[in-house]
Amino acid sequence: VATNGGFGSMRHLAGRFFGALVPIGPPAADESWAVNHLLEGEQGLWRRMSGPDRRHAVGVARDTIALLGPDQSRREVVAAALLHDVGKVESSFGTFARVWITFAAMFVGRSRLIRWAGTPSDDRRPSWRARVGLYLTHDRLGAQLLERAGSQVLTVSWAAEHHLAPELWTVDATIGDALKAADGD
């Protein structure tokens, strides 16, 4: 399946879009299951994620466990699956803005759009333009949030690396392959 400048396959993007149209989180049992796999600091980040993002993340985590088997599915691997997109909370964009930004970045280039967005100022609320940059750098921002929350190295690394080519991963290739496949990229 073809990819688009680090944004994953069109199938992945379409699935995320249609899944996000239903603005609810995972069922209570899945929510509890997820929280039980997270450290205390990670739980606060989890709760900041949108309902559709949490629902998607539970699916990624369960698929990762199915691919790796229970012996290789340590807590930090499950946390990496659950929180790989946590940096998106910093932009506070909804579904339609995310779609627009993703397509814009695919057409003009992610790095070009990040340069256009600039660096957020110290204002209380970043401008819409700055929030575009926050969304497009959610991998880096997520890693920073997770590091501050006390996450384990693998969880932090996967958030930072989940859009990179496999040869650039510091995460074990078997684990990275399972996380990537489970995410549908």
Spans of model-derived segments:
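Non-catalytic interface/linker regions that flank or bridge core catalytic/transmembrane domains
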Residues: 1-45, 165-173, 185
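Divalent metal-dependent catalytic cores for phosphoryl transfer on phosphate-bearing substrates
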Residues: 43-185
